[in-house]
């Protein structure tokens, strides 16, 4: 019997429709609770062992777990995906009223990443209905808060889960991703001296110092990064995303803060990332007679550093999964990398011994967009792929 004898495409479509319909983001009073409970109840209906686990003492932020082959802290295969989305914002259509057009399902989270969650659920349901005999355990981990600071996966790691293999279903258009950059957000504050705007020579203008730092980043740091790109991922990047300073036009500003996003490679130690920024900040501050403070923006990323991820493309796990992917997509496959973006593989691949790959339905380019959508055919392919992975690695 084929995969779709155990779960139909119509049933898979109903799953993704339900998931999109349930708001699960940081602006919801109960955050991801409703979608976590939906997933848990759907697994319970299939008599699949499942549980909710709160990740935060102050707010209802549950991870939802399910197990085949018995509960284990060291599952042979973990299907990991985040159940939160970004908010609906000003979408081109009602964000949580999904509809289908030209083989695509539209709605917030369709690509990022409820399409992938649907594939995981469908694979687990089909495996249970097929009566597969599990020699090794498999785990579904629907994690919370990835769009903020990955507290769901961080909690999973801190509570002792050590999977052997992990697949993360971020939208890769059903290509198998083996590497991506890490990221760090850094805040630099220039500290000058205020005075009346009519005599600017009596003060130290912190905005000028911050502007000089931005200039140095553009003229020196960015070209330096671009001069030695990674052969697969390209160069590291830096983006100044926030500038905040001053009070009134007639006051020389004594403080100006910039916040920047730095994407870095496995070959770039975090200490080097910091040192580059500190060196330029010191030069800019000195030129304008200012001082400066800097800090990693810890509240904007996991307390575990958002490290780069890379697995050897020739690893047995990668190569065997590529063969399964070719069976499902009916075309030759090669490993790919994400030149931009980040996934929880940066945590699971660095803070555990797990081998991590990223493969899922949808286009990352339309994630968070006002017309977010996901290909239904890719969701069906993902569902079948994850089922085959359960068979191959656990049965």
Model-derived regions, located:
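Beta-strand secondary-structure signal
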Residues: 65, 80, 139, 185-189, ...
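Acidic-glycine-rich active-site phosphate/pyrophosphate-binding loop
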Residues: 87-101, 178-189, 323-324, 357
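Acidic/histidine-rich catalytic neighborhood of metal-dependent amide-processing enzymes
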Residues: 113-185, 394-395
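Glycine/serine-rich anion-binding loops at beta->alpha junctions
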Residues: 104-119, 196
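Metal-dependent amide/peptide-bond hydrolase catalytic core
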Residues: 1-4, 14, 54, 187-395
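Residue-level signal for inorganic ion chemistry
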Residues: 19, 23, 43, 170, ...
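Hydrophobic/aromatic beta-strand patches that form the interior of the parallel beta-sheet core
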Residues: 51, 77-79, 141, 165-167, ...
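Acidic/His- and Gly-rich active-site-bordering loop/insert found
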Residues: 2-105, 129-134, 363
């Amino acid at each position: 019997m084929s995969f779709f004898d155990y779960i139909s495409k119509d049933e898979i479509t109903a799953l993704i429709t339900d998931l999109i319909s349930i708001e699960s983001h940081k602006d919801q009073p109960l955050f991801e609770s409703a979608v976590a409970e939906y997933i848990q109840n759907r697994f319970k209906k299939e008599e699949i062992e499942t549980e909710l686990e709160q990740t935060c003492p102050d707010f209802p932020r549950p991870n939802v777990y399910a197990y085949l082959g018995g509960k284990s802290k060291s599952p042979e295969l973990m299907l990991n995906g985040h159940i939160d989305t970004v908010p609906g914002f000003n979408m081109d259509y009602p964000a949580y009223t999904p509809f289908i057009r030209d083989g695509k399902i539209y709605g917030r989270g369709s690509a990022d990443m409820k399409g992938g969650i649907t594939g995981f659920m469908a694979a687990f349901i089909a495996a249970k209905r097929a009566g597969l005999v599990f020699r090794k355990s498999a785990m579904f981990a629907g994690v919370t808060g990835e769009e903020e600071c990955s507290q769901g996966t961080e909690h999973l790691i801190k509570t002792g889960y050590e999977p052997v293999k992990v697949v993360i279903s971020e939208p890769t258009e059903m290509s198998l991703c083996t590497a991506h950059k890490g990221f760090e957000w850094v805040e630099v504050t220039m500290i000058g001296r205020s005075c009346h705007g009519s005599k600017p020579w009596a003060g130290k203008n912190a905005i000028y110092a911050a502007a000089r730092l931005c200039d140095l980043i553009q003229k020196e740091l960015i070209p330096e990064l671009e001069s030695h790109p990674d052969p697969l991922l390209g160069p590291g990047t830096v983006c100044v995303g926030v500038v905040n300073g001053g009070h009134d036009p007639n006051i020389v500003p004594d403080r100006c803060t910039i916040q920047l996003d730095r994407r870095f490679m496995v070959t770039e130690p975090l200490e080097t990332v910091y040192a580059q920024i500190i060196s330029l900040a010191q030069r800019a501050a000195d030129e304008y007679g200012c001082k400066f403070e800097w800090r990693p923006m810890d509240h904007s990323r996991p307390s575990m550093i958002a490290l780069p991820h890379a697995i050897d493309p020739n690893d047995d796990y990668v190569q065997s999964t590529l063969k399964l992917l070719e069976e499902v997509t009916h075309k030759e496959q090669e490993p790919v990398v994400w030149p931009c973006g980040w996934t929880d593989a940066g945590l699971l691949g660095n803070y555990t011994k797990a081998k991590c790959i990223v493969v899922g339905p949808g286009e990352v380019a339309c994630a968070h967009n006002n017309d977010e959508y996901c290909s239904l055919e890719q969701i069906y392919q993902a569902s079948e792929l994850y089922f085959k992975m359960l068979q191959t690695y656990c049965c």
